[in-house]
């Protein structure tokens, strides 16, 4: 069978005395078995502490990774000696490794998206520190002679490629052959003198301090980039009634993308885009087209009473109302007045180039919404902008119908008095400066009063609803306890629910009992109702006779009902009835 083979169910004499004994003839086999028995250090573990690292670094001549918080104290304690090779290693030559994660939180190649394993051939680029599979660098860099980083596009040479893990040479990662293990160079917690990676040796000076400062500045963005995709998928939304109400009609598109791209994990469930609270509020207000808000602008020429179309332009109206409540329009000027066209204001700077929304950014237009209002008459309130989706705080009021502005500006309100508004007429009569259209006489908004706000009413209802359903609220707990006691009082120890004392329920119960008694007058048993009734033959009677019979039948029925009610109230269990209770 051959020496050293293991395909027999017994040990030969040579094997017993050699490989598994102490025979010198099998020393080569014994050495191979001893060498294969070690466990190489994984690429995601520190070669000093043999624990997973959080800030991986390495040297240019050796790609074995170290934890930064372990490497710096080690080099300071043992005079810049490389922990693995024993050569000199200065902090100026430290290379920060950047490893990217996939949706499952596992490290992968940022180009081919293949996951790293314990037997993957990994290399890093010295300039950027990005870690790739050797196959990716060989196919996309070395063979086409494209010597630029595939992620950052930084130029590099072949000597800048650092081998992080080579499965064909695991002996390079043998922990027993490392310099600090063979020489017992141990690092204690007292040597570290740190609490976290953000407090690494705050007293370091020179190149050490310079390196740490650079790493602190780059650590957070790099970690954010590396886990951008994983953090998105890791955030799981618990499906509740509230979250279902916040789900929009469009999906995230990840289901289709996962079946199109092989780099994404297949998904079979469609995930809806979750709207924020404001978008949910806008959808609710939009579902009620008659929702209106009312604002009173007090100017030095008089008051302007405005009606806002919240059901047609909810986002624009909400922005306008919030600016009014926060006093952003108080003491502002109408900086542009064109008689026969419009008057414009809403800029706190009074120059026509300022103003911002409540979100401190421009927001979308709403003139394409179904049923949107048009610039068709005098006294229309509309948003001023600098182009598509550039609404902020400036608005204008028209002096006449201007249909050429339809589809360019969002109409979100009107003057209550319309073309008969006396204040607007006075403002139109103020002359303007040639070239700038600035009024020669100051037209100022002195005060703003919001008299009705459907958004505030909606938010108040939401707060009340949330409080009513809050398990931690004392009122909710008292209500649930009262309901529980009432339910326990109505249920016997056999699980039977007792009849309620509600008047309607009592009336229904009495009517049911009367019907049962009436049925028992012509049938026996609850299953003989259809066959127990006496069959009568239809006879064509004289009209007078028919009227007499009907009168007699009514009297008989009235007497029967009275007797049945009396019997039911007196003693329902006095007779056998129709045996339906048996």
Curated annotation (Swiss-Prot):
It is found in: Nucleus. GO terms for cellular component: catalytic step 2 spliceosome. Pathway: Protein modification; protein ubiquitination. Its EC number is 2.3.2.27, 5.2.1.8. Disulfide bonds: none annotated. It catalyses: [protein]-peptidylproline (omega=180) = [protein]-peptidylproline (omega=0); S-ubiquitinyl-[E2 ubiquitin-conjugating enzyme]-L-cysteine + [acceptor protein]-L-lysine = [E2 ubiquitin-conjugating enzyme]-L-cysteine + N(6)-ubiquitinyl-[acceptor protein]-L-lysine. This is Peptidyl-prolyl cis-trans isomerase-like 2.
């Amino acid at each position: 069978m051959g020496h050293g083979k293991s395909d027999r169910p017994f040990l030969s004499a040579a094997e017993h005395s050699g490989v598994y004994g102490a025979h010198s003839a099998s020393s080569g086999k014994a050495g191979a078995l001893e060498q294969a028995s070690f466990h190489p250090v994984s690429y995601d573990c520190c070669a000093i502490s043999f624990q997973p690292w959080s800030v991986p670094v390495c040297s240019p001549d050796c790609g074995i990774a170290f934890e930064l918080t372990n490497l710096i104290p080690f080099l300071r304690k043992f005079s810049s000696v490389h922990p693995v090779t024993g050569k000199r290693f200065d902090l100026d030559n430290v290379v920060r490794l950047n490893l990217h994660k996939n949706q499952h939180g596992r490290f992968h190649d940022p180009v081919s998206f293949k996951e790293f394993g314990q037997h993957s051939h990994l290399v890093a680029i010295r300039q950027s520190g990005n870690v790739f599979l050797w196959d990716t660098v060989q196919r996309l860099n070395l063979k086409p002679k494209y010597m630029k980083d595939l992620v950052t596009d930084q130029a590099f040479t072949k000597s800048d490629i650092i081998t992080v893990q080579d499965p064909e040479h695991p002996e390079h990662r043998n922990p027993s052959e490392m310099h600090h293990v063979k020489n017992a160079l141990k690092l204690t917690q007292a040597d570290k003198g740190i609490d976290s990676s953000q407090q690494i040796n705050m007293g370091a000076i020179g190149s050490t301090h310079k390196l740490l400062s650079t790493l602190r500045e780059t650590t957070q963005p790099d970690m954010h980039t590396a886990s951008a995709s994983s953090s998105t998928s890791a955030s799981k939304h618990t499906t509740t009634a509230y979250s279902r109400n916040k789900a929009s009609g469009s999906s995230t598109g990840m289901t289709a993308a996962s079946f199109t791209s092989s780099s994404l994990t297949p998904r079979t469930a469609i995930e809806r885009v979750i709207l924020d609270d404001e978008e949910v509020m806008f959808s609710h207000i939009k579902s009620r087209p008659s929702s209106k808000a009312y604002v009173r602008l007090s100017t030095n020429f008089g008051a302007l009473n405005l009606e806002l179309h919240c059901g047609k332009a909810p986002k624009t109206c909400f922005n306008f109302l919030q600016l009014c409540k926060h006093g952003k329009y108080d003491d502002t000027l109408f900086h542009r007045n064109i008689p026969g066209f419009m008057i414009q204001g809403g800029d706190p700077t009074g120059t026509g180039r300022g103003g911002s929304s409540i979100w401190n950014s421009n927001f979308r237009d709403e003139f394409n919404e179904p049923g949107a209002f048009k610039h068709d008459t005098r006294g229309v309130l509309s948003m001023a902008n600098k182009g598509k989706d550039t609404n902020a705080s400036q608005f204008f009021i028209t002096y006449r119908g201007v249909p050429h502005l339809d589809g360019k500006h969002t109409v979100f309100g009107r003057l209550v008095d319309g073309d008969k508004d006396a204040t607007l007429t006075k403002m139109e009569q103020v002359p303007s400066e040639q070239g700038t259209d600035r009024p020669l006489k100051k037209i100022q908004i002195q005060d703003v009063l919001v008299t009705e706000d459907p958004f505030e009413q909606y938010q108040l209802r939401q707060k009340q609803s949330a409080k009513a359903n809050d398990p931690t609220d004392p009122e909710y707990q008292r209500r649930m306890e009262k309901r529980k006691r009432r339910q326990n009082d109505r249920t016997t120890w056999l699980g039977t629910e007792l009849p309620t004392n509600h008047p309607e329920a009592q009336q229904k119960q009495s009517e049911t009992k009367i019907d049962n008694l009436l049925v028992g007058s012509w049938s026996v048993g609850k299953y003989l109702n259809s066959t127990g009734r006496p069959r009568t033959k239809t006879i064509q009677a004289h009209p007078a006779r028919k009227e007499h019979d009907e009168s007699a039948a009514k009297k008989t029925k009235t007497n029967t009902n009275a007797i049945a009610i009396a019997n039911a109230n007196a003693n329902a269990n006095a007779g056998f009835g129709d045996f339906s209770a048996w």
